[in-house]
Amino acid sequence: MMHITHLDIRNFRNLKHIELHPSKGVNILSGANSSGKTSFLEAIYLLGLGRSFRTVQLISAIQAGMESLRVVAKVKQVGGSHTAGVEFGPAGFRARINKDTVKKRSQLATQLPLLYMSSYSHVVLDGGPRYRRQWLDWSLFHLEPGFHDLWWCYQRTLKQRNHVLRVHKPSWQQEINAWNKKLSTYGEQITSLREAILFKLQDSVSQLFTALAHQPISPVTMEFKQGWARTVRLEEILNESLNYDRAAGYTRYGPHRAEVAFYVDGKDVREILSRGQQKVFCYSLALSQANLLYRTKEQNCIFLIDDFTSELDADHRKRLLTLLNKLGMQVFATTIESLGSEIKAHPNIKEFHVKLGQVEEMV
């Protein structure tokens, strides 16, 4: 079971110097607003993805009066352990795994798979299609070797095709034909992988949602819309839509326009589920990713939850904690109020109190 055994955070927002040994199971961080709870999660997020969920300007995360920030963790996993560290300051962003410099931020994500939930996680349902594509592609990134490179090849080719569409050159027709072939090759590979992974995720989402909702619910079904008509090949529709694409200046069809729809009893979950049920459904989507990762590679991921009690009553929190322990995930979850007796019945749980940038274990 992969988990962080030691965490060292320095000069990260209001967290001056935090060192702790978290539980390999669930870690609850309670404290008032602006105490540093979300900054704690953000630091782990930075360690796992090389970016923040709050800002694109990391300089704003450096504590006032300091030159740099640093986050280091010792990570235990099957077969050994490693040390991961990130630093940002005058020299820019630097990351290491053990003593090796990390050249691509995707290497961090491979070594420390993360899932993140917050009060804004409804965006996977309410937001545009790209959020549902991101949900699908998370599993492909962690389970399909080469998917990350394949996706970037597609993105670069899409950018080149769009450029040719906008720039009127004498040779544009020849160039567009070449880009159409490349784009369709990459695009159909991505689509095939997405369809296969969605099939694997669907049953897990349905089972997890039923377990968390704790009430009779029709099975969850999903519809994958690949981004162009299924009756034709991608290259064919790229050729057919060329005049429209050229007038519009962008590519209308392809996996960058794909969509996933979620249904319960044949109805869109956004219409049939209450707000609280939708939150439970969002947890089911995230946990299905973790479950598939473990079943496929016997690899755990770390789950970050901001505002754990938001839109969840005590019964739902109890079932969620039980399920998180059962799945063997390391969890860092924030709350305003201490959960106290609510967590005593669960094994492998530690609670920490966060106040004015200081984190202390509650005994």
Swiss-Prot record:
GO terms for cellular component: cytoplasm. Keywords: ATP-binding, Cytoplasm, DNA damage, DNA repair, DNA replication, DNA-binding, Nucleotide-binding, SOS response. ATP binds at residues 31-38. One of its GO terms (biological process) is DNA synthesis involved in DNA repair. Signal peptide: none annotated. One of its GO terms (molecular function) is ATP binding. Its main location: cytoplasm. It comes from the Bacteria. The keyword RNA-binding does not apply. The keyword Nucleotide-binding applies. It is found in: Cytoplasm. InterPro entries: DNA-binding_RecF, DNA-binding_RecF_CS, P-loop_NTPase, RecF/RecN/SMC_N, RecF_2. SUPFAM superfamilies: P-loop containing nucleoside triphosphate hydrolases (SSF52540). Belongs to the RecF family. The RecF protein is involved in DNA metabolism; it is required for DNA replication and normal SOS inducibility. RecF binds preferentially to single-stranded, linear DNA. It also seems to bind ATP. This is DNA replication and repair protein RecF. The gene is recF.
